């Protein structure tokens, strides 16, 4: 018993030191695996549709989920436009619109409310849905979204800008979404 106590006591004192500083260590990175990524042009060749970019819009860096990203200037700010595509219905209109509403601090809407807020527009693929989502209590951020069904997938185009920016860029956004071919 005394031997165990002495061993514990020895370990305790041995592990303590008078150093009052935090030590940090740097380790070399493990060799990373090289992933051969397709160029943007190769990826764009795989997209089964195209669009016409408004003259005042600029391409932006796209993320892993975006097919393309754009920015558009308006008086008072810069809008972010994203294009994403998902197989099938992409989760459905109710889930997507309510996710966007939540991002703007709004409560979920019923499918009937959402359906009543949809404006139908036309592109070469046929009709698409246009939805404007605005939180009147927070005018610094609003969404203008389109849902375009193309073959066996759903394409979502979303503009994020202030309420004022949405009003200024709405015609360009509609022309852009209508240009999908």
Label the predicted regions.
Residues 5, 14-79, 86-89, 98-114, ...:
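N-terminal targeting sequences that direct proteins away from the cytosol to non-cytosolic compartments
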Residues 64-68, 123-132:
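Short, hydrophobic/aromatic-rich segments at coil-to-beta transitions
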